[in-house]
Design a protein with these regions (language model features):
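Catalytic cores of alpha/beta
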Residues: 22-30, 70-78, 113-131
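Eukaryote-skewed repeat-based solenoidal scaffolds used as protein-protein interaction platforms
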Residues: 29, 48-62, 67-81
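A glycine-rich, hydrophobic loop/mini-helix early in the fold
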Residues: 4-33
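C-terminal helical cap(s) of enzyme catalytic domains, especially alpha/beta-barrels
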Residues: 52-56, 97-98, 119-123, 133-154
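Catalytic beta/alpha-barrel core
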Residues: 1, 13-20, 36-45, 60-67, ...
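Surface-exposed amphipathic alpha-helices with a cationic face
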Residues: 3-4, 32, 50-58, 76, ...
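Glycine-rich phosphate-binding active-site loops on the catalytic face of alpha/beta enzymes
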Residues: 35-45, 81-94, 124-145
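Short beta-strand/loop segments at the ligand-binding rim of alpha/beta enzyme cores
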Residues: 5-15, 54-64, 99-110
Length: 154
């Protein structure tokens, strides 16, 4: 339903953590058939599964990186077209590490909790930032705090 309703490209998570093996390949194939622009796999996804996906689908495979111990060359050889860096406070450092070794590979990264961390990640070489905006409850909390102090909403 999301793929049908979206007016922007959708990258679909297909597993690699709890969902493993041939099921990940099947989900990737199904996502491609439904119109996904790319598929995303989690850190534990084996190289064998990534290479099977590469032989099965034509859309980009986004491989998640969460620590310095990742063999980037191996992941690229397996079929990674894009890296998704989600390494918490080490994200910008890992983005810079990847960018230094592979200047042309696209990198998507989590930006972190602040404008400063997002800018550090961009400066490190990320091509795109994923961001989770505050929920309506978080936004409304600020409004209610102002109301309780007798202040107008700003």
């Amino acid at each position: 339903a999301l793929l049908m309703a979206s007016d922007i490209p959708v990258f679909t998570g297909v597993g690699g953590g709890l969902t493993k093996g041939h099921r990940v390949v099947n989900l990737a194939m199904y996502a491609e058939m439904q119109g996904a622009m790319g598929v995303v796999v989690n850190v534990p996804t084996s190289g064998l599964v990534i290479s099977r996906m590469r032989r099965t689908i034509d859309i980009p495979i986004v491989v998640t990186v969460a620590n310095h111990g990742t063999d980037y060359a191996r992941r690229i050889d397996d079929g990674a077209a894009i890296f998704n860096v989600a390494a918490g406070s080490a994200t910008a450092e890992i983005v810079a590490e990847i960018r230094a070794q592979y200047p042309d590979i696209p990198i998507i990264a989590t930006g972190g909790p602040s404008d400063e961390s997002i800018l550090r990640t961009i400066d490190a070489g990320a091509n795109a930032i994923t961001y989770t905006p505050p929920s309506s409850a978080e936004l409304f909390k600020h409004t209610m705090e102002r109301y309780r102090m007798g202040l107008p909403y700003e």
